[in-house]
Amino acid sequence: MMRISLFLLTNLAVMVVFGIVLSLTGIQSSSAAGLMIMAGLFGFGGAFVSLLMSKSMALRSVGGEVIEQPRNETERWLLNTVRQQAQQANITMPQVALYHAPDINAFATGARRDASLVAVSTGLLQNMNRDEAEAVIAHEISHIANGDMVTMTLIQGVVNTFVIFISRILAQLAAGFMSSGRDEGESGNGNPLVYFAVSMVLELVFGVLASIITLWFSRHREFHADAGSARLVGREKMIAALQRLKTSYEPQEASSMMAFCINGRNKTFSELFMSHPPLDKRIEALRSGAYLQ
């Protein structure tokens, strides 16, 4: 319910902004409606295709292998731990995958709660004790139980639509202003080269600004997943796991995977562009119980 409410409120806000832009620019609502439909198709289409293909894309990205039958005691423990925590969280048992990487990391993905995937790096199993590993797995199970992948897709779709629509509207105005020799009543986008160039530049600029919104949500959901892990296995285990992450190698996963991993890159010039909060902030949030209410 919270996810749907957030989606509806975000769409309402976007529609209000669209209305203001149309009023200020004087663009006909009929042409704007067509553009809005096109922007929505592209904006949500790309986001939902990525969601539907997320498991296969993620496995291919890290070279992961789904564990069908455990080959050793460690894989058996991993499957049993995921199964037990999935039952606690009241979700269907996810597929479990293992991938080779020196860093301590894990991620969850999938289009639905009952068709999800939890993947763990070999570095995690080699460098964490069982309590710490349990906490990391519980963190990923919490992402699935919270529906974070779907919510992220909805937000990304709205943001994509907003970026495409506003960029094309402003590009149309710029092209019309810079074109010469047009009749006063002539319709169209003006100079096509100007329209294309301006729209591409604006999509890039607005895309960077829009990423601040999606990355804020990504950081926000990490706090809640940490809290979910604390509820499943205990606060001290999750704190110990986060402290262990401080000693990890810099994550090796592709940039497109960072939002789904427990351990994100911290080498950015601003926290605004981080997919994960700093580890110290996550530990402090657990100790204060800010997200455990």
UniProtKB/Swiss-Prot annotation:
<dbReference type="Pfam" id="PF01435">
    <property type="entry name" value="Peptidase_M48"/>
</dbReference>
<keyword id="KW-0645">Protease</keyword>
<protein>
    <recommendedName>
        <fullName>Protease HtpX</fullName>
        <ecNumber>3.4.24.-</ecNumber>
    </recommendedName>
</protein>
<feature type="transmembrane region" description="Helical">
    <location>
        <begin position="158"/>
        <end position="178"/>
    </location>
</feature>
<dbReference type="GO" id="GO:0004222">
    <property type="term" value="F:metalloendopeptidase activity"/>
</dbReference>
<feature type="active site">
    <location>
        <position position="140"/>
    </location>
</feature>
<dbReference type="GO" id="GO:0006508">
    <property type="term" value="P:proteolysis"/>
</dbReference>
<keyword id="KW-0472">Membrane</keyword>
<keyword id="KW-0862">Zinc</keyword>
<dbReference type="GO" id="GO:0005886">
    <property type="term" value="C:plasma membrane"/>
</dbReference>
<feature type="transmembrane region" description="Helical">
    <location>
        <begin position="33"/>
        <end position="53"/>
    </location>
</feature>
<dbReference type="InterPro" id="IPR001915">
    <property type="entry name" value="Peptidase_M48"/>
</dbReference>
<keyword id="KW-0812">Transmembrane</keyword>
<feature type="transmembrane region" description="Helical">
    <location>
        <begin position="193"/>
        <end position="213"/>
    </location>
</feature>
<feature type="transmembrane region" description="Helical">
    <location>
        <begin position="4"/>
        <end position="24"/>
    </location>
</feature>
<dbReference type="GO" id="GO:0008270">
    <property type="term" value="F:zinc ion binding"/>
</dbReference>
<keyword id="KW-1003">Cell membrane</keyword>
<dbReference type="InterPro" id="IPR050083">
    <property type="entry name" value="HtpX_protease"/>
</dbReference>
<keyword id="KW-0479">Metal-binding</keyword>
<keyword id="KW-1133">Transmembrane helix</keyword>
<keyword id="KW-0482">Metalloprotease</keyword>
<keyword id="KW-0378">Hydrolase</keyword>
<keyword id="KW-0346">Stress response</keyword>
<feature type="binding site">
    <location>
        <position position="143"/>
    </location>
    <ligand>
        <name>Zn(2+)</name>
    </ligand>
</feature>
<keyword id="KW-0997">Cell inner membrane</keyword>
<feature type="binding site">
    <location>
        <position position="222"/>
    </location>
    <ligand>
        <name>Zn(2+)</name>
    </ligand>
</feature>
<feature type="binding site">
    <location>
        <position position="139"/>
    </location>
    <ligand>
        <name>Zn(2+)</name>
    </ligand>
</feature>
<dbReference type="InterPro" id="IPR022919">
    <property type="entry name" value="Pept_M48_protease_HtpX"/>
</dbReference>
<comment type="similarity">
    <text>Belongs to the peptidase M48B family.</text>
</comment>
